[in-house]
């Protein structure tokens, strides 16, 4: 983020002997770490209400992660705030706070906010992290997300994912149904609509830089256009008129190419497009439906689903279409694969048909499993769960979840997030029905 200037705060103490073990968020569910996010000290020139809002956003980020359990401020004993003093650690231990966040906010002559924080280990009485951020006042929420990112990274060892965006398809709950591309913060805040609802829109995707999105729009029932929209300028342009396309492209890690599925002559195949020349290269052959391609983080492989053997299964191939290998072998239909940014897992939707109808599942599998490993793990199920996508640190999956009419009357579609362990499932609040989420990388 150009407007944010970072000043790394010099650490006051050595980190040696850190009492809290680094939390491994991949293996099962551990008890959340109690953390106290103290009221930030606000100077006379800064907005007191805004200061409280910063604390609320930090606390909410940490709570939503499932890694931390923020302690209610009503139980705080020490009344001092700010970063100019050493805390009374015994007072924080008395309320079982293993971690403490102190901070302050000042308004500079330039009009920017100077937001500082320190993360303390109350058991060893050591400072763990600290930073100062200078931000335009309207970007205070992003500053709060970045502070939460720093805390999360220090305790888990994984990069944070709070300063990110979600693009998705919003659908009105009243008739006539109107679908629009919408953009929001990862936690549902700052929702805004990017299209006017005059045409059917599908599958928004972020470009690698996260300052552009691509989506499919049906100007007519038979004509599908892929649009590119610049999120900074609002300008929009047509990337291509691809008859038979059903999903927006997914982009290579270097941002130079994209893959998509296009239906022609009774078959649907995977194509790669060079974004500079707009030239298409067909990657799959034979009969059948091949859809939902997704690049590996290094761009060398592509995962997709194909019904070439009768039932949709997952396959991996080299990015040039060679060396095709099937990777799913369970019962049911596998669709919508999404490769983790870490490269270790592939998320997917699995549909199992039984006597009582279909059951939808979101699962993960090792991208390169060993022979003795379980190939997949289901992490959530429901009437309709689909369209999984990954947080930029590869530790959280966001997906669309639907209910039939009567269960959450009338039928609804909403966006949920869940840890890759299958724990901490939570709804991301949106103004209207929501589907087809796509998670950006961490913002600059």
Curated annotation (Swiss-Prot):
BP-aspect Gene Ontology terms: cell division; protein import
InterPro entries named in the record: 6-blade_b-propeller_TolB-like, PD40, Tol-Pal_TolB, TolB_N
Chief place of localization: periplasm
Entry annotated with the keyword Transcription: no
Keywords assigned: Cell cycle, Cell division, Periplasm, Signal
Signal peptide residue numbers: 1-19
Function: Part of the Tol-Pal system, which plays a role in outer membrane invagination during cell division and is important for maintaining outer membrane integrity.
Quaternary structure, from the entry: The Tol-Pal system is composed of five core proteins: the inner membrane proteins TolA, TolQ and TolR, the periplasmic protein TolB and the outer membrane protein Pal. They form a network linking the inner and outer membranes and the peptidoglycan layer.
Family from the record: Belongs to the TolB family.
Name of the protein described by the UniProt record: Tol-Pal system protein TolB
Organism: Rickettsia akari (strain Hartford)
């Amino acid at each position: 983020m150009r407007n944010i200037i970072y000043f790394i705060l010099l650490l006051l103490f050595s980190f040696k002997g850190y009492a809290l073990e680094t939390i491994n968020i991949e293996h099962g569910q551990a008890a959340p770490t109690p953390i106290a996010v103290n009221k930030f000290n606000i100077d006379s020139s800064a907005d007191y209400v805004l200061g409280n809002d910063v604390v609320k956003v930090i606390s909410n980020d940490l709570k939503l992660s499932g890694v931390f359990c923020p302690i209610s401020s009503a139980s705080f004993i020490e009344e001092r705030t700010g970063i100019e003093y050493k805390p009374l650690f015994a007072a924080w231990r008395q309320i079982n706070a293993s971690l403490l966040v102190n901070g302050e906010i000042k308004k500079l002559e330039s009009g920017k906010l100077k937001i500082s924080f320190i993360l303390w280990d109350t058991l060893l009485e050591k400072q763990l992290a600290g930073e100062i951020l200078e931000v335009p006042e309207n970007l205070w929420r992003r500053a709060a997300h970045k502070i939460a990112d720093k805390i999360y990274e220090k305790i888990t060892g994984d990069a944070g994912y709070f300063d990110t965006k979600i693009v998705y398809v919003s659908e009105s709950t009243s008739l006539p149904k109107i679908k629009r591309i919408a953009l929001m913060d990862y936690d549902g805040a700052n929702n805004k609509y990017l299209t006017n609802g005059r045409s059917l829109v599908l599958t928004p995707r972020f470009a690698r830089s996260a300052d552009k999105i691509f989506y499919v729009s049906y100007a007519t029932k038979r004509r599908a256009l892929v649009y590119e929209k610049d999120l900074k300028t609002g300008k929009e342009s047509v990337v291509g008129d691809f008859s038979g396309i059903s999903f927006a492209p997914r982009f290579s890690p270097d941002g130079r190419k994209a893959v998509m599925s296009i239906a022609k002559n009774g078959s649907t195949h995977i194509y790669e497009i060079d974004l500079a020349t707009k030239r298409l290269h067909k990657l799959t052959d034979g009969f059948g439906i091949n859809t939902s391609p997704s690049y590996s983080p290094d761009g060398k492989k592509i995962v997709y689903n194909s019904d070439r053997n009768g039932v949709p299964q997952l396959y991996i191939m080299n990015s040039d279409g060679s060396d095709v290998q099937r990777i799913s072998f369970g019962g049911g239909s596998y669709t919508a694969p999404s490769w983790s940014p870490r490269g270790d897992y592939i998320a997917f939707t699995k549909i199992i048909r039984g006597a009582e109808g279909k059951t939808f599942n979101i699962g993960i599998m090792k991208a390169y499993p060993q022979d003795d490993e379980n190939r997949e793990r289901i992490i959530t199920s429901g009437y309709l769960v689909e369209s999984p996508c990954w947080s930029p640190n590869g530790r959280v999956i966001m997906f669309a979840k639907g209910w039939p009419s009567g269960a959450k009357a009338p039928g609804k579609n909403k966006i949920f997030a869940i840890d890759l362990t299958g724990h901490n499932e939570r709804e991301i609040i949106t103004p209207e029905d929501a589907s087809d989420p796509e998670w950006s990388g961490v913002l600059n």
